[in-house]
Amino acid sequence: MRVQEKAPGKLYLAGEYAVVEAGYPALIAAMDQYITVTAEKSESGRLYSSQNPSLVLAWKRESGQLSFSMKHPYASIESAMRTAETYAVEQGCSAQGHYHLSVDSELDHAETGTKYGLGSSGAVTVAVIKSLLAYYGLSKHPLVIYKLAVLAQMKLEMTGSFGDIAASSFGGVIAYSSVNRTWLSQAMARQSIKELVDSEWKNLEIRAVQLPMSIQLMVGWTGASASTDQLVQHFLKIASFYKNFHRPWAWSSRHPC
């Protein structure tokens, strides 16, 4: 058995930092560059990525859990695998046997490995989950994929709005408002993955947008990668400062008259 799925990268058109806070929208476009994941039934479990051609990881099942042979740089892939496998079991699938998972990326420079900034972490999470849902014969509805991918990244304590995941899951151009992370963290502590996927998520909005035909996108690349986590933390620090600066009590205490 062999299945292959792909997920596009993303580009924020507006609201890249506003959307980090629940309830604030962003406009995001999926790109025509992809991460492709192939899952093929095999005698032993293996994981390969074009980003590290010389590294082929072995994995196996121990007490119903995935176990990798060594430490590796594929935290997003492993978390996506674990999340998809757990969901498959909760859906009544028999997650037994092994498969070879192959990841091929168009979202980084082929020679240097430098990322283009098109949401490779989100895209690879989505592509892995799509491929394993197909492997187990489960629904690949974009909202199901989005929720599973978000849960996989939440387990890694990744920051950001998950807008890249939304764009990779739904494709096209979307208007997106992020889920309330506090609510989701609390829900994850008391609900199964299936229950979370089946529930309505607080503040989450994903809507397809049709741009005018007269609009053409021209994308430039700086040639340097950037850390989403670091940029988001910097934004949140500034946002927190200005929220405190504008609090009414701060002004009234300075101007008692």
Predicted regions and their residues:
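Residues at or immediately flanking beta-strands
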Residues: 98-100
